[in-house]
Design a protein with these regions (language model features):
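RNA-binding accessory domains that recognize and position tRNA/RNA substrates
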Residues: 1-180, 190-237, 305, 353-358, ...
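A conserved beta-strand->alpha-helix junction
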Residues: 226-253, 340-342
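Structural beta-sheet core signal
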Residues: 181, 205-207, 240, 285, ...
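Short hairpin/turn module used for nucleic-acid contact or packing/dimerization
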Residues: 292, 298-414
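Active-site lining segments that contact anionic ligands and/or coordinate catalytic metals
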Residues: 5, 235, 280, 341-343, ...
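Conserved G/P- and acidic residue-centered "switch" motifs that form tight phosphate/ATP-binding loops
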Residues: 186
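A glycine-rich phosphate-binding loop feature that marks nucleotide/adenosyl-phosphate handling sites
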Residues: 48, 241-245, 288, 340-349
Length: 414
């Protein structure tokens, strides 16, 4: 009897030459971690695919989870049989029946080794004849068929599937180093974080809270965002920086039109220090060119010069509708639209500068002790840990997060 399995296809991982095995092992580990809630029997490599075997009644849900893991191009629910033609032909009938509506089909057989007595063309003909008998009202079509039945012969086994679901693609998390992301409870920064994770980066989010000048609602929403990204993208640690009092100090000391730039220079500087602690090589933000006053070219340059490490802005050329569509796709949009006062709305000027002059920015920067403020914020920084197989904690900054109430208390508070 044919067993249900998942065949995971990958594209970019397969292009990595001598490092291919390394990337495949990372992807396999990430798939195992994403399926921690499932009864997985094994995750292994077979002939350019990753094979996942599990409890059969979990097949559909497991496939949906695997699709969300960066590095996965496609997921196919397949039937696993032995080399008996009767077995794999029967599996082909089942696979095509599950495909959905179709008028035409084609069989595509592939052998990973040549010790099987039948050539690929013979398997195609053999399976095709059985399918023609099972579906007499459907036609065989060699070019652009509605359904393609794949028959993969690997060692002593045959895998048969007709339906594939697209994955998120990219590279497996943990294959491209570590970055610090500025994560708010808004729409943009969760998408930017996800996009860097999709390129293989381990993302370490830093959330600047308006506390104690605002409630800590945004801190809980950010935790919800991190949980929404899981299990496909697992974030191991969230840093929380209580920024409200420092914003108040800046609002008193600096010209009102330059407040936002000063806020962001401090945020970047703190993020850079955390990046050094974490061994991260870049900062990631959710900025999109021209979307708000702080995101003009002049203002981006004025903020960027406060740090030495690279700042990645994966959304810089995206419009709001594109960002919203992606947020809906990754499951963070509804959380991000919940009302939550945070540092982004605190002590905002009526007329923020849109084309900052560097001389004026430097003068404002010297109107308060920014170095002392950065050090103070670092000492006040707290963190929350989450389950993750890719995150490796640094040996410093061991302070826990005592201010946040347990999740159950927060739900009662709602």
């Amino acid at each position: 009897m044919a067993a249900r399995v998942c065949l995971v296809h990958y594209h970019e991982v397969g292009l990595k030459g001598k490092n291919r095995a390394h990337f495949e092992h990372i992807l396999m580990d990430n798939i195992k971690a994403a399926l921690a809630a499932f009864s997985v029997n094994a995750v292994s490599r077979i002939s350019g695919y990753i094979l996942v075997t599990f409890n059969e009644h979990q097949a559909d849900e497991a496939a949906r989870v695997i699709r969300t893991v960066p590095g996965v191009a496609r997921v196919s629910l397949a039937y696993h049989t032995n080399r008996d033609p009767q077995e794999y032909c029967a599996a082909a009938v089942k696979a095509l029946r599950e495909f959905g509506p179709f008028d035409s089909f084609k069989v595509h057989a592939k052998r990973s080794n040549t010790d099987y007595e039948l050539a690929s063309i013979d398997i195609n003909r053999q399976v095709g004849e059985v399918l023609c008998e099972a579906f007499p009202d459907k036609k065989v079509q060699m070019h652009d068929p509605d359904a393609m039945v794949h028959v993969l012969v690997v060692q002593g086994s045959v895998y048969v599937y007709a339906r594939s679901e697209r994955g998120v693609g990219g590279l497996p998390v943990g294959s491209a180093g570590k970055v610090v992301t500025l994560l708010s409870s808004g729409i943009d920064s969760p998408v930017a974080t996800w996009m860097l994770a999709r390129r293989g980066a381990v993302c370490v989010p830093v959330h600047f809270s308006g506390r104690p000048q605002t409630p800590d609602t945004s801190e809980y929403l950010v935790q919800d965002i991190i949980r929404a990204l899981a299990p496909g993208v697992q974030i191991g640690r969230l840093y929380v920086v209580p920024f409200g009092d420092c914003q108040r100090e800046i609002s008193v000391a600096c010209p009102s039109n330059l407040r936002v730039i000063m806020y962001r220079r401090i945020m970047y500087s703190v993020a850079e220090r955390i990046a050094h602690i974490e061994g991260a090589k870049a900062i990631v933000t959710g900025e999109s060119l021209g979307q708000v006053a702080s995101q003009t070219l002049e203002n981006i340059m004025a903020v960027n010069e406060a740090v030495k490490i690279p700042v990645f802005r994966p959304l810089i050329g995206s419009d709001k509708q594109e960002i919203i569509a992606r947020a809906e796709e990754i499951g963070t949009f509804d959380i991000s639209t919940e009302a939550a006062p945070d540092c982004c709305t605190l002590f905002m000027p009526r007329r923020p500068e849109t084309h900052a002059k560097l001389d004026a920015v430097h003068e404002a920067w010297e109107l308060f002790d920014h170095e002392e403020m950065i050090e103070r914020l670092l000492k006040q920084t707290e963190y929350i840990d989450f389950e993750s197989n890719t995150y490796k904690a640094p040996k410093t900054l061991k302070r826990k997060h005592p201010q946040l109430a347990p999740r159950e208390i927060y739900q009662d508070h709602e």
